[in-house]
Amino acid sequence: MSMHDPISDMLTRIRNAQRVTKASVAMPSSKLKVAIAAVLKDEGYIEDFAVTGEEKKPVLDIQLKYYAGRPVIERIERVSRPGLRIYKGSNDIPRVMNGLGVAIVSTSKGVMTDRKARAAGIGGELLCIVA
């Protein structure tokens, strides 16, 4: 079976694993998924991540983060999807929960947070929001 939206699959796996308080979650790896995981780690939403497995089929393993028994990620949603891509300029990138959350943006300079994209003055595809 082919996967039509690997980013949505990644976010769903994280959401489902946190609902049952799993320590980690594994998924097929790609460069974009690793970049998103790096942003989540930099922002403190996950403990760590690692790419394991053989070269033909790498596996992304994400260590989930909890605080007082509750998941750190309260909400994680896909915004731009294959059927409806959402592109925003640097001035139009939304602030998630008035700055408490983060929007992950794919720009020409790589995958970054909404704050970094606004500071750099570049827009891009709005991949997902995390709060």
UniProtKB/Swiss-Prot annotation:
Pfam families cross-referenced by the UniProt entry: Ribosomal_S8 (PF00410)
Gene3D superfamilies cross-referenced by the UniProt entry: 3.30.1370.30, 3.30.1490.10
Ribonucleoprotein is among the record's keywords: yes
MF (Gene Ontology): rRNA binding; structural constituent of ribosome
PANTHER family registered for this protein in UniProt: 40S RIBOSOMAL PROTEIN S15A (PTHR11758)
An individual GO BP term: translation
Subunit structure: Part of the 30S ribosomal subunit. Contacts proteins S5 and S12.
HAMAP family to which the protein is assigned, alphabetical: Ribosomal_uS8_B (MF_01302_B)
Record organism: Laribacter hongkongensis (strain HLHK9)
Keyword Protein biosynthesis: no
Protein's name in the database: Small ribosomal subunit protein uS8
